[in-house]
UniProtKB/Swiss-Prot annotation:
This is GMP synthase [glutamine-hydrolyzing]. One of its GO terms (molecular function) is GMP synthase activity. It catalyses: XMP + L-glutamine + ATP + H2O = GMP + L-glutamate + AMP + diphosphate + 2 H(+). Residues 190-383 form the GMPS ATP-PPase domain. Catalyzes the synthesis of GMP from XMP. It comes from Helicobacter pylori (strain P12). Homodimer. The keyword Calcium does not apply. Its EC number is 6.3.5.2. It comes from the Bacteria.
Length: 508
């Protein structure tokens, strides 16, 4: 196992993801993690991440110096390398020419960490400081146009001024793999087949004959959690799907068919009437979210009570992923409250369940791979993200049954055309937004005054930032024609060309 000490870099999670993609199990902890906890994890190597600070600043992040007594290889990346240089007596200063973006790395000295790596390659830089003098015993391995010491080595200690974890670094994955396999002696034992076998055995032992309640939203995470649990405990899983009437077209039927194929019993609650009555007259987005969240809890509680009376439920399953775990203990210090799934946050006190989070070690892409391993269809696993409050936050203004129907039909056409054109898997997320704006139109010889709808499609890697998708005009024209001809009540279609920032992906 490789352990990454996080100094606050926006790229830290990528380090773990790249190594895991190579089959090497990797965890992330904050830079201030105690030596005792690090020793318990027994890592074969440490990686010190990048970070936004300068090592010579008074408030610079610095780990416990005893990490050097652990006798394991250490790799410092960007800030991590500068920390190593500073700690061992070298000199780091503010750079006259800062490096951001792509640069050419030139290897000047053979090293195990560069085995099989091209002499010259593109790497990704993101630093304002640079090393001008190495500590005693260190050797320069590579340089870039503005960094004379772009890679350094002293025995089992290595430093890289660039970011090998970023996809723009052409040989970055190979360099990280060399560190883990050739320097640290790790083995490629991490993969979803192994994880599934291990986790099913662990869940069987932990849960035994107890019952587990699992809220199923129809999304990837909750579906994979339910599938994994069912493999472990069979009918002791109580999977509950609440249909709040704000789902995509045919969503309920699709989820039911999926669970039938997986042979997992699913308790479906038709709560459309309850949700729509509570949303009547409400147009403020945050209030809509609040009402949906509270109503979900009411409906979920009622269903849970029903099952609780039949036989005590001991566990509540949640689709927490590894990024949620990392965020709960960030470099800014431990968080008091671990981020909860929107569907189960704020449950009443009588539901004194033990929490079970089978996916808490996994990134989103790994959860998808696990789902594939467990037999969940690829088509289902690769669906675009969908907000917890559903179509309520894609209908601007008050929600009504007729507006939901209108939006469902338009959205269905947009997604169907994206799939026909082989574009669905090329955009990160696509959907329609029903605007609370009417416009004048002409249908035949008649004047119309109907809804306008907005198409939204974005490209992103994680949703933190996004750019609008450049869809061909002919494609947009086809979608527009279909929507205005096939969906009653819509006479105008617009396309959103706002990126994030300044906009958000969803409108509400």
């Amino acid at each position: 196992m490789i352990l990454v000490l996080d100094f606050g870099s926006q790229y830290t999670q990528l380090i773990a993801r790249r190594l895991r993609e190579s089959g090497i199990y990797t965890e992330i902890v904050p830079f201030f993690e105690s030596i005792e906890n690090i020793q318990k994890k027994a890592p074969k190597g440490l990686i010190l991440s990048g970070g936004p600070a300068s090592v010579y600043a008074k408030d610079a992040y610095k780990p416990n110096g005893k990490i050097f007594d652990l006798n394991v290889p250490i790799l410092g990346i960007c800030y991590g390398m500068q920390y190593l240089v500073d700690f061992f007596g070298g000199v780091v200063v503010g750079a006259n020419e800062q490096e951001f973006g792509k640069a050419v790395l030139e290897i000047t000295q053979d090293s195990v960490i560069f085995e099989g790596v091209k002499i010259k390659s593109l790497v990704w830089m993101s630093h304002m400081d640079k090393v001008i003098e190495l500590p005693k015993g260190f050797t320069t391995l590579a340089k870039s146009p503005n960094s004379p010491h772009c890679a350094i080595e002293n025995g089992k200690i290595f430093g890289l001024q660039f970011h090998p974890e970023v996809i723009q670094s052409e040989e970055g994955g190979k360099i990280l793999e060399n560190f883990a396999l050739l320097v640290c002696g790790c083995e490629k034992t991490w993969g979803m087949q192994h994880f599934a076998q291990r986790e099913i055995a662990r869940l069987k032992e932990k849960i035994a004959n107890a019952k587990v309640l699992c809220a199923v939203s129809g999304g990837v995470d909750s579906t994979v959690v339910a599938t994994l649990l069912y493999r472990a405990i069979k009918d002791n899983l109580i999977a509950v799907f609440v249909d709040h009437g704000l789902l995509r077209k045919n969503e309920k039927e699709r989820v039911q068919a999926m669970f039938k194929d997986l042979q997992i019993p699913l308790n479906t609650i038709d709560a459309k009437g309850i949700f729509l009555s509570k949303l009547k007259g409400v147009s403020e987005p945050e209030l809509k979210r609040k009402i949906i969240g509270e109503t979900f809890i009411e409906v979920f509680e009622k269903e849970a009570k029903k099952h609780h009376l039949k036989g005590k439920i001991e566990f509540l399953a949640q689709g927490t992923l590894y990024p949620d775990v990392i965020e709960s203990v960030s470099v800014k210090g431990p968080s008091k409250v671990i981020k909860t799934h929107h569907n189960v946050g704020g449950l009443p006190e009588w539901m004194d369940f033990k929490l079970i989070e089978p996916l808490r070690e996994l990134f989103k892409d790994e959860a998808r791979l696990l789902g594939k391993e467990l037999g969940v269809s690829q088509d289902f696993l690769m669906r675009h993200p969908f907000p917890g409050p559903g179509l309520a936050v894609r209908i601007l203004g008050e929600v009504s049954e007729s507006k939901i129907k209108r939006l469902q039909e338009a959205d269905f056409i947009f997604i169907e055309e994206l799939k026909k054109a082989n574009l669905y898997d090329k955009v990160w997320q696509a959907f329609c937004v029903l605007l609370n704006v009417n416009s004048v139109g002409v249908m035949g010889d008649n004047r119309t005054y109907e809804n306008a709808i907005c198409l939204r499609a974005v490209n992103a890697s994680d949703g933190m930032t996004a750019s609008f998708s450049f869809l061909e005009h002919s494609f947009l024209e086809k979608v527009s024609n279909r929507i205005t001809n096939e969906v009653s009540g819509i006479n105008r279609v617009v396309y959103d060309i706002t990126s994030k920032p300044p906009g958000t992906i969803e409108w509400e």
